[in-house]
């Protein structure tokens, strides 16, 4: 198991916690109350800074219940915390619903998944190898 160092920037901040024994994502918590109007996006503070190990990234995902029941989900769909970022972890929550929503202090707002990744070298090419799919894009492989 890897260790992720966390600095509390606010005494009210709650360290990320897993909701179950096999959960992939640890819950992130709002440090203060924030109102998010219908169709609006607000930056929700966690009061935490993290030290993600080199070779890993922190991925911030929506909490399924919050998205389904209240229409609140990260505006960028997936947030990325790079290993060299040391600022406050914030979640840009967008209200997809028709009613104003209030995020309470201490409420779970997103999930943090820490995962390894590969860096690649991008190389310009005149041609790419042929495949059966070719340039077929959206919907090209069928619906079943």
Predicted stretch roles:
Residues 1-144:
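DUTPase catalytic domain/fold
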